[in-house]
């Protein structure tokens, strides 16, 4: 279970102070598929970054079951992310100098995992014949499937997605959503998706809406 308490993030000081997130309290149960929606600047990506331990809150806490992310130093937080959270971003963020396979295996090497299920991932994500190619040689949909494989290589319980279909055509976007739903339904992965697309949000089991850094619903 993921829980936040009074989660707050501000930038700047004095008259230039901007509140990106303002006292957000949410609970996401294991195995949920949740959409986070809201207008541009509402705090969606800020919330996702805090949930993923990619940024530190100004105030408040993020809990993964009984683990409080705010008590972890940078080293412990990096280790926790590596083992427990997979990230999928809008622009794929594959390393251009590495093949798809090398990109997928990169987190496993960081975690020093000797055994992985990369072969099964390639088959499930239909990229078996593309793993030796570099990102520039892949379509947008293939790059995103490689990014999803990378997110899953350490078998995390939680997958955080920031506009995962935002840079894809309609068909590729639908394929990515079907993959995420399958992971949620068949492997009980907790999937959290930031999106501005109402169709994407409607496919999730629950919607959290933000407005000006606060819960709108």
Go through each PLM region and give its residues.
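ABC family nucleotide-binding domain
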Residues: 2-210
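Short, Lys/Arg-enriched, disordered terminal segments
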Residues: 1-2, 217
């Amino acid at each position: 279970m993921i829980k936040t308490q009074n989660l707050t993030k501000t930038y700047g000081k004095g008259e230039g102070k901007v509140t990106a997130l303002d006292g957000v309290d949410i609970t996401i149960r294991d195995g949920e598929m949740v959409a986070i929606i809201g207008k541009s600047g509402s705090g969606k990506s800020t919330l996702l970054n805090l949930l993923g331990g990619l940024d530190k809150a100004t105030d408040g806490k993020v809990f993964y079951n009984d683990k409080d992310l705010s008590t972890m130093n940078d080293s412990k937080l990096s280790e926790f992310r590596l083992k427990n959270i997979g990230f999928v971003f809008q622009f794929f963020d594959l390393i251009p100098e590495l093949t798809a396979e090398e990109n997928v295996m990169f987190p496993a090497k960081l975690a020093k995992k000797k055994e992985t299920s990369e072969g099964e991932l390639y088959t499930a994500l239909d990229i078996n014949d593309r793993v030796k190619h570099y990102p520039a040689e892949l379509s947008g949909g293939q790059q995103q499937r490689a990014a999803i494989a990378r997110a899953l290589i350490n078998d995390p319980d939680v997958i955080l997605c920031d506009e995962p279909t935002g840079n894809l055509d309609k068909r590729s976007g639908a394929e990515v959503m079907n993959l995420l739903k399958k992971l949620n339904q068949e492997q009980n992965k907790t999937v959290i998706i930031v999106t501005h697309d109402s169709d994407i949000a409607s496919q999730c089991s629950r919607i959290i809406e933000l407005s000006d850094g606060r819960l709108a619903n």
